[in-house]
């Protein structure tokens, strides 16, 4: 999953979300392995991934309903993993019936669900707001966020043009934002190493230990 996120870091947001639907670690972590339909009419639904997909990954809280979550859960049935290496789509465990999601009714499958979500403005605003908070300031300027979102939509959800526009803007270099961002423990320790030309090739355990003491352990969620 780390490699997947790096691959799409400045790439296409929509394609990232589509690919993440089939990421074995994500399927395991958010319980979609337990989300399946059986064609005899019985089912085991797990709403965890559908809820996080809408709330934390694409739209943000308040832009969907509980009913949307329930119907999106049906769209995501049948995707599971064989551990952490490969994803599996089982048609016999997928609910092919019509669903109504975000006021659209159709046989909405896994990829169709993402297409439907990205037909709305919320994903562009959601990610633009997150990028602003990460690179500029914790309280977003909604006018700038809307400008970023418009650029994202124009470029079919490519992230790089949005970042280029932000980094080239006068707003980004406003003196009021200087010193407003803190380095994470990993950034702090590795930047210190880089600036002081310290060789840590044989002392990585110390770096990991000090980062742990500072509250960040690599590859342990949410870090």
Predicted regions and their residues:
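His/Asp/Glu-rich metal/cofactor-coordinating catalytic motifs and the adjacent surface-exposed loops
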Residues: 2, 6-223
